[in-house]
Amino acid sequence: MPFRSNNPLTRDELLSRFFPQFHPVTTFNSGLSGGSFLIEHQGQRFVVRQPHDPDAPQSAFLRQYRALSQLPACIAPKPHLYLRDWMVVDYLPGEVKTYLPDTNELAGLLYYLHQQPRFGWRITLLPLLELYWQQSDPARRTVGWLRMLKRLRKAREPRLLRLSPLHMDVHAGNLVHSASGLKLIDWEYAGDGDIALELAAVWVENTDQHRQLVNDYATRAKIYPAQLWRQVRRWFPWLLMLKAGWFEYRWRQTGDQQFIRLADDTWRQLLIKQ
């Protein structure tokens, strides 16, 4: 249910107006993007979310609501309420582990997602790369960063292999191991893009695991594994630049030292892969 309001509500106002019988249970602070909190009434639970990026346009938060509204409940939480600065979605019972599931199981989840109807908006990386450059700490803007940005701008994004709806933030912390199978949470970066971009963006432990995930996906998608892996590799510079830029952007927003450490590590990976 979308609900429009020009004036953002406080947490207490939200609960008293829309969920008067519910009470907060716990706050989630895991992950790099921010937290949310859980509300409960007689065994029924919802997750109350706010935009992770306070500087992002409201349209980005609305897109997340729209994506969840059209996705099947077997892979994503169903939304119940959207209004300015707040979204309420189903709580997904299950276990969030610290490591990825079996690559074949994960490939099956991603392939099923990629068979769903498209969201209706494209993921384009270059505007994000340029935004992160502009919004980063000037003292952190290096000649090498600018050189790589210009190189990608000139090269342009790889040609699409297959255009599908993507999650774009697949890692162990966003996967719920439920009784009915794997499900994905945190859909704030979702949009339509190349399936190989999604596979390139998965937070894997090592190259062997990455290759196996791509091979398992290729089998389901009836694509030659070598062809799919080549396409995944074409996206690597874009993804590493995206991660490094996002970490730099979040460092300037929050001052949290973990983002500097992650940015430095990603810059080192970029140098190795050039």
Curated annotation (Swiss-Prot):
Belongs to the thiamine kinase family. It catalyses: thiamine + ATP = thiamine phosphate + ADP + H(+). Keywords: ATP-binding, Kinase, Nucleotide-binding, Transferase. GO terms for biological process: thiamine diphosphate biosynthetic process; thiamine metabolic process. NCBIfam families: PRK10271.1, ycfN_thiK. Catalyzes the ATP-dependent phosphorylation of thiamine to thiamine phosphate. Is involved in thiamine salvage. The keyword tRNA-binding does not apply. Pathway: Cofactor biosynthesis; thiamine diphosphate biosynthesis; thiamine phosphate from thiamine: step 1/1. GO terms for molecular function: ATP binding; thiamine kinase activity. The keyword Transcription regulation does not apply. Its EC number is 2.7.1.89. Transmembrane segments: none annotated. InterPro entries: Aminoglycoside_PTrfase (IPR002575), Kinase-like_dom_sf (IPR011009), Thiamine_kinase (IPR014093). This is Thiamine kinase. Pfam families: APH. It comes from the Bacteria. Coiled coil: none annotated. HAMAP family: Thiamine_kinase (MF_01604).
